[in-house]
Amino acid sequence: MAHKNNEKLHIAMLGHKRMPSREGGIEIVVGELSTRMAQLGHSVTCYNRRGHHVSGEEFDSEVLSEYKGVRIKRVFTVQKGGLAAMTSSVFAALKAAFGRYDVVHFHAEGPCAMLWLPKLFGKRCIATIHGLDHQRAKWGRFASWYIRFGEKCAVKFADEIIVLSENVQAYFKETYNRETVFVPNGVSSAQQVDADLITEKYGLHKDEYILFLGRLVPEKGLRYLIEAYKSVDTDKKLVIAGGSSDTAEFEKELKNSAAGNQKITFTGFVQGRLLEELYSNAYIYVLPSDLEGMPLSLLEAMSYGNCCLTSDIPECSDVIGDCGFTFRKGSVDDLKNKLQFLCDNADVTEKMRASSAIYICNKYNWDDVVCKTLQLYGAKNITEFSAHKKEENNENFVGQ
């Protein structure tokens, strides 16, 4: 659909589970982009899956037709056998192809298997690669093949490909000789809150626990974390916050591994005030991943002023810079030693806390992400609706 420079864009987004949702990083990204674009006056439609929250129907929220100016449409979804992502993206792509859209934005590699269809109907198609999903351990042979097929469709048909890390950018250049655009995720400044619900529900107090927050999937390195933590001499608890994502057996394995250790707590999926309290009162935040796209949970943890310890994969180490610590990916011994060091040296963690929030909010800003994305859509005369204000971010953390 042609559009004049001063007209709003009609945008469709697909590939996520639901919006609004915190079921994964993709859902957070789609929520931030779509609502901010709608605030700018663009017409945005998000195609949501039908069915239940991946961590259980107890986390289902109200079914909405509109959220903060964004239209929400639900598409047919097959819930069985890991087919939800594939079937929902197929039907979303069909609707987007026949809809009156200027731009169709595909999120994640698998959904890009249908990118050719709206392209065939003259839509401008953008793909965001949130990570090299075919490498994830949870997928079987067919799923991995299909995701890789989606990756190749993005390479062949997408007008622009957005990547979230320079490591993935290098992968596309070396594998396909395809140019991509590096647009890392953003983060919003956060206000710390007191421990209240987490004390009542889990007996947790400020600075008395080590926090992992994310999906319970094999590539997050949770096996290493539990094994390493068991060897650390500390009174601090280990809190593993997050739900499964088609990985119920893996979640069961983790809980069996932690059985008998009263200091390890599994909270399940968390959101809202509970999430804010966990971030605000952790002693350190740990992300031991083998594979990441760009970990939003790490950005969020730093925005709350946490001292962070991550694996040394580029997707994590590039984010924390000099404002955190890393261990050798997959090394239980190195992870154990770094955990022990941080538990024994509160002055070191406090020093990192003082700098992490200001650093991360100054470096990664959602308004910048929106403006860069709109430029890739072909929007003209873009004005940042909420300019990046470093001074404001700095003030938010004075005295915290």
Predicted regions and their residues:
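A conserved mid-protein helix/loop that constitutes part of the nucleotide-sugar donor-binding site
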Residues: I28, E208, F212, V217-S231
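Glycosyltransferase donor-sugar binding loop
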Residues: R50-H52, V187, L213, K237-K252, ...
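Membrane-proximal helix-turn-helix segments that form the acceptor-binding/catalytic region
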Residues: L94-A97, L120, S144-I161
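Nucleotide-activated donor-binding/catalytic signature segment of Leloir-type glycosyltransferases, i.e.
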Residues: E251-R273
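Short alpha-helical donor nucleotide-sugar binding micro-motif in glycosyltransferases
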Residues: F269-V270, E277-A282
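Aromatic "clamp/platform" in nucleotide-sugar-dependent glycosyltransferases that forms part
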Residues: D290
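Short hydrophobic beta-strand element within catalytic cores of glycosyltransferases
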Residues: C307-T310
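Conserved acidic donor-binding segment of nucleotide-sugar-dependent glycosyltransferases
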Residues: F325-D333, F341-D347
